[in-house]
């Protein structure tokens, strides 16, 4: 749906270049039988940011305005398993910093908040890939 939007399936029939990063906000499951929720964000090019073309299928949204993030960079293709491994490593690196219990991915007031994964490369690039996992702080 989002790829079709940037390829011209929008009210203005405007094709846009793909931008980076592709950001995936991940809302962890709160109960054992639930699935995590993934929300994928494509950034629109700067010339469309004030007035992005509308679409019945893809809805422009503003991202949450978190103040800070702890970030861990990693290579390769991004998937559920390496996101999980990298997120665990990022959480481990925060132990004892005062941020280890305040990140948005830690349970807060009975609910889990989001963390994000970002991919910076085209799916056709196979070498020197750059990805990040992010824990958000307010």
Where are these regions (language model features)?
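A solvent-exposed interaction/effector surface
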Residues: 1-138
